[in-house]
């Protein structure tokens, strides 16, 4: 990964996906430190809890933001160290920071990286969600319906309608919908959106498995 540093420095979002055959955790840590050093920028570690970072001597001496405490300073470099969705709420409103995300669970933050146009240090590619203006508008509609946390029946009905639009366009992607909402919503709220997605997916499966009521399925005609 060190050979890619010049390319990495061209990007604001850097994604280190969890490797299944080779170690990406330690190289990801070194990459985050190198990005901050090359940019002469303040480095903040964002991690689920302090213990997940402090047993690394290089990270223990840095500012560590956790699910329970702190917020990163905007304008520096953030090392999202094996983060959870919950702790990633802390970077939602950072407008100028460079984010290096080192993933723990394989592909957990793939949708996040696609939405952010992140540079994937494993593949050497800039990721892209490939959203058209129309699909982006539908996703924004889903987020807007969550202004009260998807707590009302009408919120659910309208959201289900938007999800049907995505499915009709062949653009329904559960993880992408959740990642889009996570750009501005809390994880507590996201749990309610997940239930709506579950309901939608169940209804979609029933459309596939339930025969048309007008089609004769009995041999007793």
State what each model feature region is:
Residues 1-221:
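Short, flexible loop motifs at catalytic/binding sites
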